[in-house]
Regions:
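Conserved AAA+ ATPase "SRH/arginine-finger" region at the nucleotide-binding site
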Residues: 98, 111-124
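Conserved small helical "lid"/interfacial subdomain of P-loop NTPases
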Residues: 118-146
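Loop/turn-to-beta-strand initiation segments
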Residues: 18-19, 50-53, 79-88, 160
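Conserved catalytic/switch belt of AAA+ P-loop NTPases
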Residues: 64-92, 102-107
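Short regulatory helix/loop adjacent to the ATP-binding pocket of P-loop NTPases
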Residues: 33-37, 92-110
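Walker A/P-loop
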Residues: 1-21
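C-terminal helical "lid" of AAA+/P-loop NTPase domains
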Residues: 129-133, 148-155, 162-177, 186-189, ...
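Short glycine-rich substrate-engagement loop in P-loop NTPases that contacts/grips substrate
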Residues: 17-53, 59, 63-66
Length: 218
C-alpha cells in the first residue's frame, strides 16, 4: 500500500472517534498564502489547530518555503501541546529532507518513523483482483481481462500502487473500448511507458553489474 493510500486509511479509521483533518502539503501552502493575502492568519491558525489529529501528505513539498515552514512549526507545537497527534508522509526519511529546517526534521525524527516499502507480489496481485472486481461491478459485462493479463500486470508493474492502479485502468479501458480481452502483446503496447519505467530503474544489482563489466571483474 502506498503512503497516500495508507494515510487515507488511517484518517478514515481515526475519524470514527476523533476530529481528523487530512490535507496535502501543497494544499496547506495554498491556504497559508490565501490567508496572508486576506490578512486573516488568525482564522488560518484556528482552522488548523482545532483538530485532534492532523494528517499531512507529501511534507517534502515544504522544501525551501521558509515562511510556510515557520507556520507549520508553530502549528506542530500548538497541536502537540494540547495533546493532538500529527502524522505526515514524505518520499524520503526525515534526515534526507533537503531545505527543511533542522528543528522540524528533529520533531519528525523524535516520533515514530515508518519506512513504507514497495508492494510485494501478493499485495500487487490482491490489488489487481480487487480493482478489476470493483470496475466489473461498475461496468457489468463490459470488461474482459484474462488471468494471464492480471498476472502479467502484477509481475511487471512494481514501482508503486499509483502506477499499478493506472495500469489496471488502462487495460480495463482498452477492453471496454475494443470489446475484447487484450493478449500479452496488446497489454505490453498499452503499458509500454510504465514497463519501460520499471525496466530502466537503477538498482544496486544493475550498478554492480555495470561496474564489474566496465572494470572487467567478476
Amino acid at each position: 500500500m502506498g503512503k497516500t493510500h495508507l494515510l487515507n486509511s488511517i484518517g478514515l479509521e481515526l475519524k470514527k472517534n476523533h476530529k481528523v483533518m487530512f490535507i496535502s502539503a501543497e494544499r496547506f501552502m495554498y491556504q497559508f498564502v490565501k490567508s496572508i493575502k486576506a490578512n486573516d492568519m488568525v482564522k488560518f491558525k484556528e482552522y488548523f489547530r482545532n483538530t485532534d489529529i492532523l494528517l499531512i501528505d507529501d511534507i517534502q513539498f515544504m522544501n525551501g518555503k521558509e515562511a510556510m515552514q515557520e507556520e507549520f512549526f508553530h502549528t506542530f507545537n500548538a497541536l502537540i501541546d494540547k495533546g493532538s497527534k500529527i502524522i505526515v508522509t514524505a518520499d524520503r526519511a526525515p534526515n534526507k529532507l533537503s531545505r527543511i529546517q533542522e528543528r522540524i526534521k528533529s520533531r519528525f525524527s523524535g516520533g515514530l518513523v515508518v519506512d513504507v516499502q514497495k508492494p510485494d507480489y501478493e499485495l500487487r496481485k490482491n490489488i489487481v483482483e480487487k480493482k478489476i472486481e470493483e470496475l466489473n461491478n461498475l461496468y457489468p459485462d463490459q470488461i474482459k481481462i484474462s488471468k494471464d493479463t492480471k498476472d502479467f500486470i502484477s509481475n511487471e508493474i512494481t514501482a508503486s500502487i499509483r502506477e499499478l492502479v493506472g495500469a489496471i485502468n488502462r487495460i480495463v479501458s482498452y477492453s471496454r473500448i475494443y470489446n475484447k480481452m487484450p493478449n500479452q502483446a496488446e497489454t505490453k503496447v498499452v503499458l509500454k511507458d510504465l514497463l519501460n519505467l520499471n525496466e530502466n530503474k537503477v538498482t544496486i544489482d544493475l550498478i554492480q553489474t555495470l561496474v564489474c563489466k566496465f572494470f572487467k571483474i567478476s
